[in-house]
Amino acid sequence: MKKVLWIIIIILMVGALAGCGANGQPITAETEGIWNHFFVYPLSWVLISVADLLNGSFGLSIIVVTIGIRLFLLPLMIKQQKSSRAMQALRPEMEALQKKYGQGTKRDPKDQQKMQKELMALYKDSGVNPMAGCLPLFIQLPVMMAFYFAIMRTEVIALHSFLWFDLGSPDPLYILPVVAGITTFLQVKMTSFQLNDQMKVIIYIMPVMIVVAGVTLPSALSLYWVVGNLFMIIQTYFTVVRFEQLKTDISK
C-alpha cells in the first residue's frame, strides 16, 4: 500500500511540474519552463528527427521512439521487478509480524514501533530495500509523461496520417482505442499475481480509462499506447511470467 502511495505522490509531483509549462501550446525550442525545455522539447525534437530519417512518417517515428525509450528504461524496469520479487518473498514474514502486533488502528503505538523495528531488521538481514522498487519510478514516470506531452504538443504530427487514421484525430474506426484497451488489460493481468486483492480492481479500471481516452484523443497517443503495451507484454513475459514458470518448475 505504501508503494502505491509513493506512485500517486510521484504522479502528482510530475503532474504539478508539467502544469507549470504544459499549457497545451505547441512545443518549440523557444518554449519556456524547465519541464518544457529539459523534458518535452528534447523528445519532440527526437520525434521530428526520426520522422525525417523515415521519409517523414511520424507514425513510424512514434513506434521507433517508443521502443527506444522502453529499451532505455528496461534496466530500471528489471531492477524494479527484482525488488518486487524480493519484497514478495518476504511477504509471509511481514504478514506474520502484522498478525503478531495486531492490525491497523488496533495496534498500540509501542507495538507499532516494535513492529517497524523488526521490519527494518528483516529488510536488513534479507538485503532488501523497501524503497528500491519506487526509486526507478522517479526516472520512468517523468520520461513517459514527457513523451506523452511531446506527442500532444508537436504540432506537425497532427498534419500527418499513418495506415488508416490521421495522427491528429481520433481513430474513426475505434480500432486503436480498443486494441490499446485490450493490450493494457493483458499487460496488467500478466502481473496481477503481484497485486493485493484491493488493488486488483485496477485490472479492469485501467483498460476502460484507456479506451475512453483513446476515443477522444488524437490517434497518435493510441498508437503510442499500443506500441508501449506490446513492448511491456513481451518484457513482462520474459522477466516476470517466464521467471515464475521456471521457479515453479525448479520447486517441483
Curated annotation (Swiss-Prot):
It comes from Alkalihalophilus pseudofirmus (strain ATCC BAA-2126 / JCM 17055 / OF4). It is found in: Cell membrane. Required for the insertion and/or proper folding and/or complex formation of integral membrane proteins into the membrane. Involved in integration of membrane proteins that insert both dependently and independently of the Sec translocase complex, as well as at least some lipoproteins. Belongs to the OXA1/ALB3/YidC family. Type 2 subfamily. InterPro entries: YidC/ALB3/OXA1/COX18, YidC/Oxa/ALB_C, YidC/YidC1/YidC2_Firmicutes, YidC_ALB_C. It is a multi-pass membrane protein. The keyword Thylakoid does not apply. One of its GO terms (molecular function) is membrane insertase activity. Residues 1-19 form the signal peptide. The chain crosses the membrane at residues 34-54, 58-78, 131-151, 162-182, 201-221, 223-243. It comes from the Bacteria. A lipid is attached at residue 20 (S-diacylglycerol cysteine). GO terms for biological process: protein insertion into membrane; protein transport. This is Membrane protein insertase YidC.
